[in-house]
Regions:
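Residue-level signal for inorganic ion chemistry
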Residues: 320-321, 417
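Catalytic alpha-helical scaffold of carbohydrate-active enzymes acting on polysaccharides/glycoconjugates
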Residues: 2-202, 227-248, 254-296
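Charged, compositionally biased N-terminal leader segments and the immediate start
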Residues: 297-315
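Aromatic-anchored, charged helix-turn/loop surface patch used as a conserved interaction hotspot
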Residues: 315, 321-405, 455-464
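A structural motif
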Residues: 196-215
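A mid-sequence, solvent-exposed acidic-amphipathic segment
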Residues: 204, 217-229, 233, 395
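C-terminal non-catalytic interaction appendages of large macromolecular assemblies
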Residues: 394, 398-466
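A non-catalytic, amphipathic alpha-helix used as a structural packing/dimerization or gating element
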Residues: 84, 140, 144, 230-233, ...
Length: 466
């Protein structure tokens, strides 16, 4: 099987209703990353100094050396920036992404976080890059991070965010069974569920755009006013749409500088001036989402073996299980676990088939109100479809008219008249009969194939979401 693991469909065109508390139009979620004292440093057993997210844009790591200037920039975040932000945000729900070793080196800051009632989620053991870390090393660090976090704060973390993660991170976090949510994703404006083995893991996605890290990156913000404008524009769009979540990422050593902190203060005033704004921690959002939208597992088409797939979807195209068999061999993924997605895969096989094969599918369809219907020998799907348009309750005159049209159509084109009856009533079907009898064969063959595909979509919508 060719299977593509990435989910490119998510909540789709119509996201679920968030139903935020108090009928809020938007949930605003502020994250304060506490990393100072957990960054790369040979004092921490690392091979080199830190080089990421500081005032020294483009800095390089110094192998085997301490970087005095870099260390002092991080120290500013703990010594001054944190307290400026604490004074500003103490009355708001905030989630701290706390590096466990940094928390252990900042007991006064931890006490202040707890006094403010902030959530302290885990940001890992050390603030290092795990993209090349062996899986067993990353797992061991995660376990130690949970242990140390619990030891330092008194309670285990309910949320996890590595940041500089690996392809294994989300799976490893889910496998702990520890977390109400994992935040190592930027894939959506709303929480969503992922299935990892036997674990149903809620993802509360984070942000790298509404994030003060862009003060320390090329093409980022170089003044507080730019950050403020971006936050306000993001807020306005999400507020207008309604039922959305706005995450804001902050770092003590970045937004904690006085020339930037003012932008944050002004944004908070701006957001609070609106009605229907719910400031919340990430754990509050996770609890709300889990209660409002508990996960329900389904038999996902992309995860079925060939026999089960064909048994389930082989009748979507009338009497043509070969189409389902062909679709199973395509590259399928989460995007094909919806009615529209699987429909596309099945139609690809149908459209790519030769003329004789497609004509065979057309001829597998019964006449409308024909002899098979009278003998009750239609498939269950065809029976229900014809009944939906009242074709199972025709008068003698109506039945005679249908049979005459069927005969004329078959004589002209060489295949039965096919129409997605769920889109029509009896009068609409008869009008389509008359109109389509005027087509040339090529035009009508194309239209009949479109109707076959439309029938398949209706059948799939009765079986799958969206």
């Amino acid at each position: 099987m060719q299977r593509y693991p990435r989910d490119m469909t998510g909540h789709g065109a119509e996201p679920p209703a968030a139903d935020w508390p108090g009928d809020a139009r938007i949930a605003v979620q502020i994250v304060l990353n506490y990393e100072e004292g957990g960054e790369n440093n040979i004092l921490h057993g690392d091979a080199a100094s830190e080089a990421f997210l500081s005032e020294i844009v483009g800095s390089a790591a110094w192998p085997g050396q301490r970087h005095w200037n870099m260390e002092s920039i991080y120290e500013y975040g703990a010594r001054a920036g944190f307290w400026r932000l604490h004074r500003m945000l103490a009355c708001l729900p905030v989630t701290v992404y706390g590096i466990a070793t940094a928390l252990a080196r900042g007991p006064e800051q931890v006490a202040a976080m707890q006094d403010a009632g902030w959530e302290i989620a885990s940001h890992g053991l050390k603030w290092i890059d795990y993209k090349d870390a062996p899986e067993d090393v990353e797992r061991a660090d995660m376990i130690e991070a949970i242990r140390l976090h619990t030891e330092v704060t008194g309670t285990p973390p309910r949320g996890w965010y590595t940041g500089r993660c690996s392809v294994n991170t989300v799976r490893l976090a889910a496998e702990t069974g520890q977390f109400s949510y994992v935040a190592d994703s930027y894939a959506d404006d709303l929480p969503y569920w992922v299935e990892i083995g036997r674990h149903d893991q809620l993802i509360v996605p984070y942000t790298l755009d509404a994030n003060d890290m862009r003060f320390a990156t090329p093409q980022g913000f170089n003044a507080g006013a730019q950050f403020l404008d971006y936050l306000k524009a993001s807020f306005d769009t999400l507020y207008r749409e309604g039922g959305r979540m706005m995450s804001i990422g902050l770092h003590c050593r970045l937004i904690g500088r006085p020339g930037r902190a003012e932008a944050l203060r002004q944004f908070i005033d701006y957001a609070q001036a609106h009605d229907g704004v719910w400031f919340a921690t990430r754990s509050q959002i996770a609890d709300h989402w889990a209660a409002q939208h508990p996960h329900q597992r389904i038999a996902r088409p992309s995860q079925l073996d060939r026999d089960a797939f064909v048994a389930t979807y082989g009748g979507v195209f009338e009497h043509s299980p070969w189409i389902a068999a062909g679709a199973h061999g395509l590259e399928l993924g989460p995007a094909h676990d919806t009615a529209l997605g699987l429909h596309n895969a099945l139609c690809r096989v149908f459209r790519s088939a030769g003329d004789d094969a497609r004509l065979g599918v057309l001829n597998a369809h019964p006449d409308l109100a024909g002899k098979l219907a009278a003998a009750k020998r239609l498939t269950p799907d065809s029976t229900a479809e014809q009944a939906s348009a009242g074709l199972d309750a025709l008068t003698d005159a109506e039945r005679a008219a249908f049979q005459a049209q069927n005969a004329a159509y078959l004589d002209r084109f060489g295949f039965p008249f096919i129409i997605a009856v769920r889109d029509h009533d009896k009068a609409g079907i008869m009008a389509a009969f008359a109109a389509r009898l005027q087509n040339d064969r090529a035009t009508e063959l194309a239209e009949a194939c479109r109707q076959v595909e439309r029938i398949a979509l209706h059948r799939l919508r009765a079986m799958l979401p969206r």
